[in-house]
Amino acid sequence: MGLSIGVHILNLLTIPALVFIYYFRKTEKVTFKGMVYATLIAGAILLFINNIIIPYTVWIGAQIDTLFVNTFGLPVNSGITLFALALIIGLGWAAWAAHRRGRVLLNIILLSTTMILVGYSSYASVTIRAAANPPMNSNNPNNPHALLSLLNRDQYGDRPLLYGAQYSAPPEGVKEKKVWYLDEDGKYKTATVLTGYTHAPEFMQLFPRMWNYSKGEKAYKEWAAYRTKTETLRDDKGEVLRDAQGRPMRGETLDFGRKRAYTDSYGETRTVTEPTFWENVHFFFNYQLSYMYWRYFMWNFVGRQSDIQPSRTTITDGNWLSGIRWIDEKYVGPQDNLPREIAENKGRNTYYFLPFLLGLIGLVYQLNRDQRNFSIVLWLFVMMGIALVFYFNTSPGEPRERDYVYAGSFYAFAMWIGFGVMAFKDLIVRLTKRDDRTAAVAATVIGLVVPGILCAENWDDHDRSGRTYAHDIGWNYLQSTLPNSIILNYGDNDTFPLWNNQEVYGVRPDVRIMNTSYLGGEWYIDEMKTKANDAPGVPFSLPKHKYTFNNDMIYVTNSIDRPVEIKEVIDFVRSDDPRSKVKLADGTLADYIPAKRIALPVNKENALASGIVAEKDRDKMVDTVFINIKKNSLDKNQLMILDMLANFDWKRPIYMTQVYILQDFGLMDYLQFDGYAYRFVPILTPYRQAGEVGRIDPEYAVPLLLDVFRYGNLDDEKVYSDYFTQYNLSAARAR
């Protein structure tokens, strides 16, 4: 179990099944009381490992390390190393003492805990690797406090399970947490971070499934509303719809939530729509269970409509499909005269319920023949399926399908499919009076129909041979860039292909890849400041205390109603003078940017020398690039981009994989499209419309498009271009 934690935390969900295996082996007569005790023990073990061993082992080591580093002046990680040695020696001595005194149960508990900790110690490799400061070092867990944050999955935040507030609940206050971090002087320091909001008791309720305030009423209403009401119909702009005679049109609409009034901090009365308890229950069954679990289950054992991921629930994409016409027509409508892209989609796989039915037969067979082992498989099925649905408390609008999360549950059902073959064997023996060997062969032949149809239906859309487009996206982005460039990207799809090319295949080690999604983390800013491969660090100038648990959001004002040079702006933010601060409502002082119009001078000679501008375009350069901040605040990642622009002095080309990275700075008029990536250039090209952003230098881009870029062998008819490949290819075309 300890080793499995090092592989994936979801392995803990096998604990109930393992406890029942032990219980069944140790008892001859299974009783209801015994099963209740076994369940309670399984829950206790699960909580002990997940809530005590995993967090508190490292937490104690982190506290000792803080004492050793801050008080005794010893090196970082010396305290947790001594604690680990003392823990191993202590557990070893305790287990030996328990053995000598004949304390069997205590000895088993101590040995089990020791083995769990031995496996858990594999996470020490994470700290060892981080200490080496590799080019890719997520969260930089080079000390026990950073490792603890990683293990606690702090970056994902908390979500309520049994009791809490819903998405519409107005915040009453903030939740804060003290965190430890390693400062530049080698000492541990503390900071206070915002972890959430507090809410008035009247906005707290049981079973809060609709908790994510970033989603809003529209996303939840689609899945949770089950009541209707008659009211005046309105269009998307809120205008009343009228018939030919000009009379207001009335119709049935979804009735959602209940109105609740409250008094805000300014003493004004406001109203919010609060979902009811039964709407939360409906959302749980309709979206979280049905759409986000049973739909995936049916994909695997009944069939799948297509490999197209819908942006929202539709009747044409993303559903299960059996291949049995009368069932499918009832569920997803008529299947005649379908568009070609639906009817010929290789992801349209139909199994005619055969795997599902064979699994049900196996389930009933095992239940009748071996109830003990049936309960073990059932524990695996439930814990890795329905229990995870409850724990994840998923919100609508997932960026990708999450069927892989429930693979363990589907493995359990596949066991019942195997028992279904055994059921056929027993049936053949009973009907034909043949020996077991002949019946086993016959049952196997019959059972092979299921994997046979799965193979026949899935082979074409799961065949990735020859398709290299995911890799080639990264290749193309990197090859778009000039030597010694910095390329800014956003999100997974624009990041991992670049990392793969650079770190695995050694493509363009001179380019610094910077993921702006991570740039809000102080660890990533520190990482970007250092050299990686052959690429120098990003020229940030703000000191560590300005971005370490600080300035997650910085205000932008028009205090100076004229363009201010960018270095002066960064110097203003860097200053600790109280006059360079703004006083917040709670009386604290915060950094701010005093101007929305910022001047970025152009060093033309550097721009020419670095290749940012070709010699033939010398006369097209402007003297100053003007940044126009359109918002009243910037996120930390945008502040750091501003810092980079203040200090790069046009010595290194800057690229973006998406034009919108610079949209909030008003810099979309200063881009050049180099085939895949956009180059930031001091040449004004007024923004025209989406898809026509920036200028193009044919002498630079055309050779790349024709001779350098790779397109994943998509011109080969034998290579399958699935939905995500087509989606990313369309995005590349749009750019």
What are the language-model segments listed below?
Residues 1, 9-406, 413-484, 496-735:
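ER/secretory pathway lumenal C-terminal domains and tails of membrane proteins involved
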